[in-house]
UniProtKB/Swiss-Prot annotation:
Pfam family, one: Transferrin
Main location: secreted
Disulphides: 26-60, 35-51, 132-228, 181-207, 204-213, 271-284, 374-411, 384-402, 478-551, 506-678, 579-596
Name of the protein in question: Transferrin
Glycosylation-annotated residues: 218, 355, 418
CDD domains: PBP2_transferrin
Subcellular location as annotated: Secreted
Record keyword Transmembrane helix present: no
Length: 681
């Protein structure tokens, strides 16, 4: 009796513990409200979930590894990133599939489709054919074919370091195939994209619109590649099984056959061994993309069943209405929301089942091209390494490597001496770096919704009569701090360039020009005024709040010299810009800063040496990474706080990257030279 009682108590306690099971779901901080709304959804399961905020999915993986969270939804590429984290014990324990193919082992399988009578019996004979692809950088139409073809001796080598890895790919494909259709953005830089499409134009010649070679195109995408094959004189198409079956009206999973004008008997799958298989039968796939799913640390296996059931019930609850949390928190979608249990498996083994690791790790032939980014702190080194693995997982090449030096100047010297390829500088340091280390700018940060550089601007109150610089002589001025481009360097350069003041003793002369008094914060600091000149006029208009916008608001000044990034402090109904960059002067609204300003401000800029890698190679990885993450900062927020530090590698305020135009750089050099004559640069 006592034994039965103890057994009953033990079972009751076990049930209670199971009922009280709780799990920590990691979610990008931007989606915390959505996660909390999800927690309010009633389910049969009484398992408790807790939302743990992280910077992004990359940080979520670290949180799971460190037991700060238990699990996180991931893509196959994230599984690869997870496999590279030291001392990790991740397991993939649930898959996200489609209702159409709930039992399919993979999300999709890559196939080659050819005309049945095409005289071909091995993959080498693909050389010289007319090829149809889904689009550049896509899995079944681009990445997987390249992974397969580069193993063949007849495929051109892709290790020419005089051009970028991406151009190596395009050059090889254009040499191997007679004509093709490969639409999309070949480069994140518009000029490079245009140049490549001109040079390798026959990679576009099979498209509906060869001159554009971009989406939308009738011969792009999964079905478009098959249309290209069937109706546009194509000889081989690279696509996936499910769309091949749909194209020919064949049943797919739970979806029955449907009428089609296409005849499957006229086409065949081309297998890796060179044999052909009927379209109506089992496809011979040679690589696949795994399903998305949930990844957790090994400890979740001890109490896996209740967690799996909870996730399934939440997925079922959200399937009809697709609330925000459905996608943003659980990672489900309109098509992919069937949650299936799988045998828990290590991420790398999960990818290997589909031969997908090989696709991710596809190289270009030894020696692999590497771009070395120089950084100056341990935190920046950690971020650089995280960026490197993430970019590699997303097929962004060249490989990013990280070099650490103890100062900005040491990094610039490292680039000059070919110890690294890239280093960043802020503001007018870009011109100084060019002069001292013989470097040149490659790309820079852009800001705001419009993704533009910042500009030095002159703000005045509406109703005033100022239209050009001469109208301000003898007036009062407000400035951003002494060390800033917008507050000091730009207005000084403008006044000197317009011969409104002399370049000798230029700061003192600035005070003479605005003889009504100024507020230039920091002008009286010993390091800024080593000779101890009388700069009282330049401090005369400063109050308890020395910000330029407060100075103008309180009528302590007639004009404020600030950055366009500061315009949010000004009421557009009360203030306007003075267009000093226009010969006729004039005024414009605050939002017109790109065309009404004092000068473009140099952003944080990355510089390179002239004698080593091409600028296109150097810029491709950072620009591609920025382009990919522009709409998906939840994957990796490269502009956000990193390990509780701000402005690591990129400024927090940045919204993207852009190549630096030579003309803009020449202007910065001119400004630098003029300001140097004042002894300021």
């Amino acid at each position: 009796m006592a034994l039965k009682l103890l057994t009953l108590i033990a079972l009751t306690c076990a049930a209670a513990n199971a009922a009280k099971s709780s799990y920590k779901l990691c979610v990008p901080a931007a989606y915390m409200k959505d996660c909390e709304q999800m927690l309010e959804v009633p389910t049969k399961s009484k398992v408790a979930l807790e939302c743990v905020p992280a910077r992004d999915r990359v940080e979520c993986l670290s949180f799971v590894q460190q037991r700060q969270a238990d699990f996180v939804p991931v893509d196959p590429e994230d599984m690869y990133v997870a496999s590279k984290i030291p001392n990790q014990d991740f397991v993939v324990f649930q898959e996200y599939r489609t209702d159409e193919e709930p039992d399919a082992p993979f999300r999709y399988e890559a196939v080659i489709v050819v005309h049945k009578d095409l005289p071909i019996n091995n993959l080498d004979q693909l050389k010289g054919l007319r090829s149809c692809h889904t689009g550049v950088n896509r899995n079944v139409g681009y990445k997987i074919p390249l992974t397969m073809l580069m193993k063949r001796a007849v495929f051109p080598k892709m290790n020419d370091h005089s051009i970028s890895p991406k151009e190596n790919e395009l050059k090889a494909l254009s040499t191997f195939f007679a004509k093709s259709c490969i639409v999309g953005k070949w480069s994140p830089d518009p000029k490079t994209n245009s140049a490549w499409k001109s040079q390798y134009s026959h990679l576009c010649s099979m498209c509906e619109h060869p001159e554009r070679c971009d989406y939308p195109d009738n011969y792009s995408g999964y079905e478009g590649a098959l249309r290209c094959l069937a109706h546009n004189n194509g000889e081989v198409a690279f696509t996936k099984v499910i769309f091949t079956r749909k194209f020919f009206g064949l049943p797919v999973g739970t979806t029955p056959a449907s009428p089609s004008n296409e005849n499957p008997e006229e086409f065949r799958y081309l297998c890796v061994d060179g044999s052909k298989a009927p379209i109506t039968g089992k496809a011979c796939s040679w690589a696949a993309r795994p399903w998305q799913g949930l990844i957790g640390h090994n400890d979740v296996l001890a109490k896996l069943a209740p967690l799996r059931e909870k996730v399934k019930q939440l997925a079922d609850s959200g399937a009809a209405d697709k609330p925000e949390w459905f996608t943003k928190v659980l990672g489900l979608s309109e098509k992919i929301h069937h949650v299936a249990d799988n045998i828990p498996i290590k991420p790398i083994d999960y990818l290997n089942k589909a031969n997908y690791t090989e696709v991710i790790e596809r190289g270009h032939g030894a020696p692999e091209l590497v771009v070395r980014l120089c950084v100056t702190s341990n935190v920046a080194l950690s971020k650089c390494r995280a960026m490197s693995v993430f970019a590699f997982s997303r097929d962004i090449r060249p490989i990013l490597d990280c070099v650490q030096e103890n100062s900005e100047d040491a990094c610039l010297k490292s680039v000059q001496d070919n110890g690294s390829d890239l280093a960043s500088v802020d503001d007018m340091r870009v011109a100084a770096a060019a002069k001292k280390y013989n470097l040149h700018p490659v790309f820079h940060e852009v800001y705001g919704e419009l993704k533009t550089p910042n500009y030095a601007v002159a703000v005045v109150k509406k109703g005033t009569a100022y239209n050009k610089i001469d109208d301000l002589r003898g007036k009062k001025s407000c400035h951003s701090s002494y060390s800033t481009f917008s507050g000091l360097h730009a207005p000084l350069f403008y006044l000197i360039n317009k011969r409104a003041i002399q370049s000798d003793h230029c700061v003192k002369n600035l005070g003479e020009f605005f003889s009504g008094g100024s507020c230039l914060p920091g002008v009286d600091k010993p390091e800024n005024n080593p000779s101890g000149d009388d700069v009282s006029k330049l401090k005369k208009q400063c109050g308890s709040d020395s910000s330029a916008w407060k100075c103008l608001e309180e009528d302590r000044g007639d004009v404020a010299f600030v950055s366009s990034a500061d315009l949010s402090h000004f009421d557009a109904n009360q203030y306007e810009l003075l267009c000093l960059n226009r010969d006729a002067g004039g005024r414009d609204v605050l939002s017109s800063f790109a065309t009404c300003n004092v000068a473009m401000a140099p952003s944080r800029t990355w510089v390179a040496a002239k004698d080593f890698l091409s600028d296109v190679s150097i810029a491709h990885t950072p620009l591609s990474l920025a382009q990919m993450l522009a709409t998906r900062p939840d994957l990796f927020n490269i502009y956000g706080e990193f390990l509780k530090n701000n402005n690591v590698i990129f400024n927090n305020a940045a919204k993207g990257l852009a190549t630096t135009e030579k003309l803009d750089f020449e202007k910065f050099k001119t400004i630098h030279d003029v300001i140097s004559s004042c002894g300021l640069a």
